[in-house]
Amino acid sequence: AKPMVELNTADSLTLLKVRGIGPYTAHTLIKWREKFGGFYAVNQLRDLPGIRAENADIIASQVTVDTSLVKKISINTASYEELVRHPYVSGELAGQIVRFRGYFRPFESVRELGQLDLRNPLDFDKLVPYLITHSTEDSTRSTR
């Protein structure tokens, strides 16, 4: 059996060895990996534009992700621009985060985002792996 390829560190040549990944898909994966700050789950492949679901499943069976490599964003210190750059953070959410901590207090937990008055419901499971409340917080600690 071929060794699993780790998605957060693989370069395009390594990605091309995975069945289901051609040059376009390798480029797409690296582009989105940079936008996200890393992948926390192989099923995120299904979210990526330009990768068909059946292809995502073929790829997913041959790759792993090292979640310790995911870049975290501190909701208490990140600027609006830093927040909104993340694909899962809408302009509305970024604005509310900055407003909340400006008017009230720093966030004590990422779960407090659920109390913000947002037009669109948050997809917590997608968002939580990328967010922390303190830049020094141990990123391995679960927020569930």
Please report, for each region that a protein language model flagged, where it lies by residue.
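Membrane-embedded segments
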Residues: A1-G20, Y24, I30, P49
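Extracytoplasmic
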Residues: A1-K2, A10, Y24, Y40, ...
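Small-residue hinge/turn detector
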Residues: G22-P23, R52, S90, N120
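Residue-level signature of tetratricopeptide-repeat
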Residues: R33, F100-R101
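Compact, charge-rich alpha-helical regulatory domains located at protein termini
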Residues: V42, S109-Q115, P121
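Alpha-helical interaction/regulatory segments in DNA maintenance proteins
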Residues: P49-K71, D117-R144
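Short, solvent-exposed interaction modules
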Residues: K71-I97
